[in-house]
Amino acid sequence: MRYYATLGPSCCDTAALAALLRRGITGFRLNLSHTPLAARTDWIDALHAAERETGLHAQLMIDLRGPEVRIGNMPAPLPLAEGAAVTLGADIPVDGDVLNALRPGMTVLLDDGAMALTVVDGGVCRVTRGGTLTGHKSLTLEGADLRRPALCEADLADLAQAAALGVNAVMQPFVRSAGDLRVVRQTMVENGLADAELFAKVENQPGLDALPDWLALCDVVTIARGDL
């Protein structure tokens, strides 16, 4: 059995990480959705120090951005009341390819599925599951293929630095096809990560439907329930 913890502000100093190692944590995930790997070298240094202190070793996994879609910056939290109308692009900043993909009746999931909208017309949507939305949260368009590359520029930069920092596992989010994993695996090999484990994260229906095609191309499958 493996046990993972996420590196974060409350879990990033040597003492806390050493305590987690002693309690049986076998791996640490570093979420790169909001920040580059280079900005978290202090956390990684603390983890390696904790490993030396305890004599225990943990897997260090980076969770990439991948083809994930996120909303833009918002000056203030936006309350979304169930039944209310909200406009993507005007009220909620989104990229142009998102606006172009909208179709009436389409479901839009926000913040890993915590909130949901139904497209009425153009960018106008009806809130079907309310909450309070803040900037840079995830956005999923059910049934849409935005054809974004498997790895974004930030992912490529992070993978280029990963081996030198002791990373030995890579998580690819929003896996859609075998092609996605082939791209990620080849990029890992090119950056000295040939022996690192590849975790494939299923976060949408297309990825789930294609699972038989890509299952053999990864080492571990992770199910992200929020957007499913």
Task: Show the residue positions of the predicted features.
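Non-catalytic helical/linker scaffolds that mediate oligomerization, partner binding
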Residues: 1-228
